[in-house]
Design a protein with these regions (language model features):
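Juxtamembrane inter-helical linkers in multi-pass membrane proteins
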Residues: 1-2, 73-90, 120-142, 206-228, ...
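Transmembrane-helix bundle segments that line or gate the permeation/cavity pathway
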Residues: 1-125
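Short, surface-exposed, polar/charged, turn-prone segments marking secondary-structure boundaries
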Residues: 5, 31-34, 111-113, 161-164, ...
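Hydrophobic alpha-helical transmembrane segments
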Residues: 13, 48-52, 93, 143, ...
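Hydrophobic alpha-helical transmembrane segments in multi-pass membrane proteins
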Residues: 19, 23-31, 107, 149, ...
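Membrane-helix interface segments in multi-pass membrane proteins
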Residues: 26-57, 156-197, 251, 255-269, ...
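Long, contiguous internal "core" modules enriched in hydrophobic/ aromatic residues
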Residues: 62, 82-177, 181-190, 194-203, ...
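Intrinsically disordered cytosolic tails
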Residues: 191-296
Length: 296
């Protein structure tokens, strides 16, 4: 039996309009006032207002991630049973702020903990039918990949210093064969670092999806690093060769990628399933679209 989607374009449009009116206009107005105050010599007050505007966007970014997931679950049907959450996501927005900041404080070494902790918190507040989701992903499962990404720039830098000390880079200029060699090193650095980043994210997604459960159902996400690379290359080619018009199709590609590699296993006892008692919004969650965040 197939899952059904009950959302409408009008809901998403209304959600987007509400975000513009309730958050967008006040944000731009506050930013304009802050700049005007700075121009008139009230630097401290202007800087304070500007900081408030940025912190507000930071906070609403976390709320947006929560409410977007809540909306999608509330519009997903299976045997007329839907999902959702009784939480509005406002407390999650605070968790998103402090956990993200803590993740960056020790030179970024706690970023895997921040990502997995936020995943667990968000999904643990969601439900489908009468049963809540459970998520207990651990940062240790992805830390090795993250450490590889984290240390790669330092290893490359030390390697270039050693090569320079040995005279292997002596005399390299910016033109001719020498320039091409330097360009190749820079290109390898960025492509290699990007590939390691994709490898980390692929491992992260396999870890967190595999640690998510609903009643007796367990989930897995089987996309490999190469699958992610193919997806990103396809995205880039689609946008470039359509002169940017293909951007509107990226969310469909991402959703297809997600559903193709997602697997679920376990037993569903139909007699236990009842309709969800969570609240359903009358409009789509336009926050996430307004902040230009990806569907996955």
């Amino acid at each position: 039996e197939h899952l059904e989607w009950a959302g409408t374009g009008m809901e998403l449009f209304l959600g987007f309009v509400m975000v513009i009116l309730l958050f967008g206009l006040p944000y731009f107005g506050l930013s304009y006032v802050a700049q005007a105050l700075i121009a008139r010599g009230y630097e401290a007050i202007g800087a304070g207002l500007g900081a408030i505007a940025l912190i507000s966007i930071f906070y609403l970014g976390g709320v947006a991630r929560f409410r977007a997931l809540r909306y999608r679950l509330s519009r997903t049907r299976w045997r007329s049973i839907r999902g959702g959450s009784d939480s509005g996501g406002f407390l999650f927005g605070l968790s998103y702020m402090w956990k993200t900041m803590v993740g960056w404080l020790p030179l970024g070494l706690l970023i895997p903990w921040s990502m997995t902790s936020l995943w667990n918190e968000r999904w643990s507040k969601m439900s489908f039918g009468p049963f809540a989701f459970e998520a207990d992903a651990e940062a240790g499962g992805v830390f090795a990949r993250f450490l590889l990404f984290y240390l790669a720039p330092f290893v490359m830098f030390v390697g270039m210093l050693i090569m320079g000390g040995m005279g292997m880079l002596a005399g390299y200029g910016i033109g001719g064969e020498n320039g091409r060699a330097i360009g190749g090193i820079v290109l390898f650095f960025y492509l290699g670092l990007g590939l390691i980043a994709v490898a980390f994210y692929a491992k992260f997604y396999r870890e967190v999806v595999g640690a998510t459960r609903w009643r007796s159902l367990h989930f897995s996400f089987e996309a490999s690093t190469m699958d992610w690379v193919k997806l990103l290359i396809g995205d880039a080619l689609l946008v470039v060769f359509t002169l940017g018009l293909g951007f509107v199709f990226l969310s469909y590609r991402h959703w297809k990628f997600f559903m193709t590699h997602l697997e679920a296993g376990g037993e569903i006892l139909l007699d236990e399933l009842t309709q969800s008692q969570t609240r359903t919004a009358k409009h789509g969650e336009g926050l996430l679209d307004a902040f230009d965040m990806g569907a996955i």
